[in-house]
Design a protein with these regions (language model features):
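Gram-negative bacterial Sec-dependent N-terminal signal peptides
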Residues: 1-21
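Extreme N-terminus of proteins, especially the signal/transit-peptide cleavage junction
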Residues: 18-20, 27, 60
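Outer-membrane beta-barrel porins/channels
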Residues: 22-37, 41, 79, 84-97, ...
Length: 419
């Protein structure tokens, strides 16, 4: 039997508090843009890190430039009122409140650009656009639903932008994306303490962008990052060295497409305002399914499935910037980030919920070549209730419920150098 592991969105409980974007998308790719809660990121092009949202923005940056950035993501998350019910209706377990489910993480990024001539520009970006790590205690009441969820990624994007007219710029990029996934959970009502599934893949996508400058004060940008369809290869192992569970697996993991549109307007020499809309196409995430080529104790294929049924999400943000003097710039922003998960589809790996961003940032122009940016964001997520069902087969299924609360702080720094 063909081994399949459909991981169309390897995600984890409160991942959105770690990444603070719906699903497992890490929006933190620009310290400058973060100061405005990413308002106008698709049109801003204040430095080359904005090309993550719109590759056409390369044409606003003359000569050769480099941007180095890093975001420190510090989440707080808790699960309360944890209950597990067996398939026969009996109470399987009642767990204590769980804290420190998610852990701090670092998301680095680097972008370089070069102007070929008056119209043509090239660039290269290295980002970590998707990722999370979440870990429950192995003995928690809902361990059949998930213990550890770990997803890491790296994307290299060669870019090209062309100034078609004095007002219109167009850009294209190729995403070269690597992902690595690691999942653990108990099985058969904890008779098997830990089952580990792990895999990795390297696949490709693309990026498109357009930037229209109405005048020197007003510009509008449109960006698109394609879905990347990954085919992971790896293995599944059980801690008790059970041959039926120790086997090679293949996997499908699709990172979603994203469309964005942004506007930026300079009111005067001091004040600027900006707005952003982003849509992430999570609706391709229908279920999380493990199917092995060996039989379980019932004589049927080993199957573990959780229906996800994610929806496409919307992200809205508004921001303003104030140029305090020739060197210092103050940035402010607020955003509303919609959850990809509906109540009926929440799981311990993905109890996502809507959230609000509050951001502030500073820019410092040291000289004509060197500048620095810093951003801080506090994100408060709505309380998330979960009541979910997972099954390996008709004889072994459990229901888990819990209440989740989470928030996060994000600190971002970057340095930009114009050679």
């Amino acid at each position: 039997m063909k081994k399949v592991l459909t991981l169309t969105a390897l995600s984890a409980v409160l991942l959105s508090s770690t990444a603070m974007a719906s699903g497992f998308h890490l929006r933190e790719q620009s310290a400058a843009a973060q100061g405005n809660a990413f308002a106008g990121a698709t049109a801003g092009a204040e430095n080359i890190s904005y090309t993550y949202f719109n590759v056409a923005g390369l044409t606003r940056h003359k000569g050769t430039q480099m941007n180095l950035g890093m975001s420190y993501i510090a989440p707080e998350a808790a699960a309360k009122n944890v209950h597990v019910v067996n398939n026969d209706g009996s109470l399987g377990a009642r767990g204590s409140d769980i804290h420190n489910i998610v852990h701090a993480a670092v998301s680095p990024n680097i972008t370089v650009s070069h102007q070929i001539n008056d119209k043509s520009f090239i660039g290269l970006a290295i980002n970590t656009p998707y990722g999370m790590i979440t870990k429950y205690d192995q003995e928690w009441a809902g361990s059949d639903h998930g213990i550890t969820s770990d997803l890491k990624s790296a994307t290299i994007t060669p870019m090209f932008a062309y100034k078609a007219t004095d007002k219109l710029s167009l850009g294209v990029g190729m995403q070269i994306q690597y992902v690595w996934a690691h999942l653990t959970n108990s099985s058969m009502g904890k008779q098997i303490p830990v089952v580990t599934s792990e895999g990795n893949a390297l696949d490709f996508g693309y990026q498109l962008g357009a930037l229209y400058e109405f005048n020197e004060n007003t510009r509008l940008g449109v960006g698109y990052r394609s879905q990347v369809r990954h085919k992971l290869k790896g293995d599944m192992k059980a801690t008790m060295n059970i041959p039926l569970l120790n086997q090679d697996i293949s996997a499908k993991l699709d990172t979603p497409a994203m469309f964005s549109v942004g506007a930026h307007h300079d009111i005067n020499d001091k004040w600027s305002v900006m707005a952003e809309y982003q849509r992430v196409f999570w609706s391709s995430f229908k279920n999380l399914t493990f199917v092995g080529d060996s039989m379980n104790y019932t004589g049927k294929p080993y199957i573990s499935q959780v229906k996800e049924n994610w929806r496409d999400t919307n992200f809205w943000s508004l921001g303003t910037s104030y140029q305090m003097d020739n060197q210092w710039k103050l940035r402010l922003g607020v955003a509303y980030d919609q959850s990809a998960v509906r109540f009926k589809d929440r799981t311990p790996r993905i109890p996502d919920s809507d959230r609000i961003w509050y951001s502030v940032g500073l820019g410092y122009q040291y000289n004509d070549k060197l500048s620095f940016d810093a951003g801080y964001t506090y994100i408060k997520a709505h309380k998330a209730k979960m009541n979910t069902f997972v099954t390996e087969n008709a004889a072994n299924s459990v229901n888990a419920s819990a209440d989740y609360t989470n928030s996060v702080q994000i600190f971002a720094l970057s340095v930009n150098y114009n050679f």
